[in-house]
Amino acid sequence: MRFQNPFAFRPGPVSFWTTVIYLALVIPLIYVHETVPPAPSDRSLYQGLNLTEAWLDLQTISRAFHPYNSHENDVVRQFLIDRTKEILDRNSMPYTTETIGGVDWHTRNAFVQTQDSDLNPRDEFIQSRPRGATLFDDKISNVTWTYNTARPTGTNIAKGTWMGQYFEGNNYYVYIHGKDDPEGEWWRSESAYKKFRGQGGVLVNCHFDSVSTGYGATDDGMSCVSMLQLLSYFTLQGRQPKNGIVLLFNNAEEDGLLGARAFGYSPLLHFTHTFVNLEGAGAGGRAILFRTTDLQAAKVYAKSPHPFGSVVAANAFERGVIKSATDYEIFADIFGQRGMDIAFYAPRARYHTNQDDTRHTSVNSIWHMLSAALASTERFSQITGTTFHGDRSDGKSDLVQNGKKAEGVWFDIFGSAWAVFALRGLFAWSLTLLVATPLILVAITYILARKDKYYFFSRDIKMHHDINDDPVVLGGWKGFLRFPFALVFAGALTIASTLLLAKFNPLIIYSSPYAVWSMTLSIFYFSFWLIMRGASFIRPSALHRGYVLIWLFALGWGLQVVGAVAEDRLHIAALYATVFLQSAVFLALFISLLEQFALLGKHDFAMQLHDAHQARDISSHGTDHESRPQPEEEPAQPEGDEDESEDATETTPLRANEPGYGSSTRTSFAATYRRSVADNAPSPPRMRRYQPYEHEQSWSGRLPSWTWIIQFLLLAPVPVILFGNLGLVAMSALQMTGTDGGSLLVPVLTLGIVSIFLLLPLTPFIHRVSHHVPMFLLCVFAGTFIYNLVAFPFSDSHRFKFYFQQVVDLDNGTDTVSIVGLERFSRSVIKSLPSASSQDIKCEKAVGRDLMECLYDSSSLSPHLVEGKTPRELITFETVDGTNASKGRLRIDALDSRLCYLHTSRPIYGFAVDGGAARDPRFGGFPSEGFKTIQLWRRDRDRPWTVNLYLDEHSQQADKSFEGEHKKLGDGSVVHRRADDPLEVTVRCAWSDANKPGTIPALDELLKYMPTWAAVTKKNVGLVEVRKTYKV
C-alpha cells in the first residue's frame, strides 16, 4: 500500500490538522480565561508573605457591609491600623505616627516654583537611611470642589448637571522609608518638597470601604489584604526598598473616588512619582491590568509571574467605552502620577451584591493580585535615573516631575508571557505593511511574469494566429470572486443570528456566553464552507487558495490604513492584533506566489500540451492501414484511443469534435501529411504526467501539495491567540452590562464579529475540509440557536441585578421604594413581594440610566434608621447669623448619618463649609450659570455642617476662588435678587447601614422574597433618603 502524505492538501489532512490546531489553540485560551493560577503553599512563598494570614484578614474585613456611611466602616479602619502596627512590631520595624494633613498644594507649588532650582537633591541625604516607617492617620484633610456629573474628573466643559461637593476624609497610609530617602521628617520642610521632585517613591493604593449592599471581599478587600502582605514583605530585615513606598488605605472610593481626592492634601503627594492602584470591579477570578499610563509602566508590570491584560482595555477607558471609574483617574489624570490599574473585572453579576464575599472567591485570586502588585511595586521602587524622574512630557510644572512618558502596546500570551513595545513601533510596523509588503508582492509578481509563470488572472493562450485555432485554456480567473461572495453570505448570516438574538433574548449571554460563541462560530464556519466547497466542486481551481489570500491581503491592507491613522492621530493601539494578522497573510500570500516558480511557463506548458496532442494524433494515425484514404472517407479509428475515453477538461479545445480541431476526421491533405510524417518518424516518448487534484487545471499538477500547512501555521496560531484572548476578555467584560443599562446588542454583536475574525485564517483552506466537520457544526448551530432563543437568561449563579432605594418624602407624606432595572424582570421581582403584590406598579424612564424605574408604596415598611426616632426627627435645619440677600448661612444636621444633599430653588454661585478648604480647581471647573445641588460629607456624625451659600453672582462676600473662576467664565451680567424672594432648600439626608436586620424593612423583604435569580444593589449612595424642604 502506497504511503499517503499526511500534510497533502487533501480533505483528510486538511480536516484533521485545521481542527486539531484550532482546538489546541482555543482550549488553552478558555482554560486560562476561566481558571486562576494555583497559589503556592505558605512554605514556598517569599519570606514575609503568608496567604493563610491574608485569607483570615479578608474574612475579618468582609464580615459585614462597611460603606463610608456606616459604623462598620470605622471598625474596618481600626482593624487595618491595628494590623499594620502588629506587622511592624513582628518585623521589628521602628515606626512613628503622624496626624499631618490638609496641605494646600496650590500655595506650596507657588512657593516651590520661586525657589532656587540649583539645589542638589542629595545635599541632605546620607549614604543609606535606616529602616523605618511612618503611619499617617489623616483626620484633617477635606476637599471642596464643583464638577459636572457628565465628567466627574473633568476640568471645564461638559454637558450634564453641575454640583458642588464637600468631603471630610479619614485616609490611613503607611510610608516605608527608602534607602535613598532623606533623613528625618522631611515632609515638614518646604525645601524637602523641592528635593522630592527627584527620584520619588511608589504609591500603592486600595480602598477599604464597600458598597452598602456588598461585603467587599473582592471590591476591595483583597487589594487591602494584599497591601498588608506587601507591608510585611518590605519591612523585613534586608528588604528595605531603594525608593520609599507609600501604602494608602483610602476611604469612600465607592461614593465618588473621594478618598483619592483627599490624598491630594497629603504631604507625600509629590513624593510619589509612580503608583499601583489595586481595585475590584468583579468578584474573584484573575486580576487584569486594566490600564497603564505609559509604556514604561507597562514594562514594569512585565515582572508579574502571571500577567493578564491588554492595551485594548486602556483605550476603551480613554474613549469612554468603559465607564467604570477607579482611583487611577485621580492619580494619573489629576495628580499627574504614572502607574497602573490592576483590578478584578468579572463576574459583574456578583459585583456590588451580597455575593461579593469570601465564599465566592479564593486564595488563588488573592495570590494573583498579590503577585502582580509585589512584582510591580518592587520594580518601581528599584528604578533610578530619568525613567520616572525629570521634566514632564506635558510641561506642567505644578504636577509631579516624573519624566517623559511614551505610549505603548501590551498584551499577555496565555496568561504566562507579557508582550510590550512602543506605539511608534506599532505605527512603523503598520507603515511597513502598507508600503513594503505590496512592493515585495509586486516584485515577485513581476519576476513570475517575466518568467511567464504568473498564473493568477491569466488569459487563454493561442498557439497560432489562425482565427480558427482554439486557444489553450489556463483557467487563470477561476475562483477569483468566491471569497467576497462567501464572506458576505457567511458574515450576513452570522450578524443576522446575533441581531435576532438581540431582539428576542439578548440577555442569554449573561449566563450562557459560550452558547452564543458556539452559535456564531458554527454558523460562520458552515455557511462559509458551504459556498466555498460548492464553488470548488462545480468549478475546481488550483488558484482558489491564492485568490482567498489576495482578498485577505487587500482587506487587511484597508484595515491597516485605519489602524495606522488610529495609531498616529488618535493614539489608539487597540488594533494591534490586525498587524499580526496582516503580517501572517502577507507571508502566506508570498508562499503562494513562490509556489508558482515550480510551474512551467504558461507558453511552455501550452506548447508542450499542444505538441503532446499533435504527437498523439500523429502516432495514432501512423498505425492506420496504408491504403490511400479518400477525402470523403473517414479514416479508421485505432482501438484504445484515449481521446474517446477521456472526459473533456479546460485544456480540451472547444471545437474538439470538428474537423481540424482534435477530431479523428481529417481533410485529405492533413491525413496524407500526417501519415507521411508517421511513416518517416519514430513514435515520440510519452510526456511525464503531473496529476492535478481532481478536475483542477492540468498545469497545477506541478504545484507542491504540502506548502499549505506552512501557510496555515503562519495564519492561525498568533491571530487566533490574540483575537481569541480579546474576545474572551470582551465577553466577560460586556456580558453582564445589559442589566447596568448598557446596550443589549453590543455584547452579542461583539462575539459575532470576533467569531468572523477568529475563522478568517481558515478561509483559504476551508474548501478542502470534508463534510464531516461542517455538518457537525450545523447541528451545533441548530441546538445552540434554539437554546439561545428560548432559555431563561438568569440563574442562581448569574443573577439579574437591579437597584434599590427607599425615599421618605416628609413634604408629601410618602414612603416609596424605587426599583431600577430592566422592566420585564423588575416587575417579576416586585410581584414576589407581599407588600407590593396587589399594587398597580408604574414604571418610567430612569434618570441618567437606560433603565426603567418602578415605584411602589412602602409605607407599611417604614425604615427604623435611629432607635426611638421617627423620620421627621432625623433632620435638623436652621438659619444662622450672617444670612442676608446675597448669602445664606445654614446649619444642617442628620442623626447618625455622614451624608446630606442640599438642593436650592435657584442657582448659587459658590459655597463654603465652616472649617473646610477653599474650592480646589484640580477636581473640576465652575459653571458660569451657577449650580443648585451640593453634596456634604463629614467624618464626625455628631458635628453639624455650617454652610455658606453665595446667592449673588457678584457677591463681595463670596469665596475668592469661586468669584475668580466665575469672572473668567461668566458673561458679566448682573443678577439682582430681591430681598423678598425666598430661597427654598430641599435637604436630603442618606443612610446606608443595613447590617442590623429591621433597620430597613423594605430591603429585608426584598432579600427574603425576591426570586433566587435576582440580586439587589444600591441605586445611590444612600439606601434610604429622607427629604424635607425649608425656606430661608
Swiss-Prot record:
SUPFAM superfamilies: Zn-dependent exopeptidases. Residues 33-426, 504-511, 567-573, 730-745, 795-1032 are vacuolar. One of its GO terms (molecular function) is metal ion binding. Keywords: Glycoprotein, Hydrolase, Membrane, Metal-binding, Metalloprotease, Protease, Transmembrane, Transmembrane helix, Vacuole, Zinc. Residues 616-666 are annotated as: Disordered. Its cofactor is Zn(2+). It comes from the Eukaryota. One of its GO terms (cellular component) is vacuolar membrane. One of its GO terms (biological process) is proteolysis. This is Vacuolar membrane protease. It comes from Fusarium vanettenii (strain ATCC MYA-4622 / CBS 123669 / FGSC 9596 / NRRL 45880 / 77-13-4). The lineage of its organism: Eukaryota, Fungi, Dikarya, Ascomycota, Pezizomycotina.
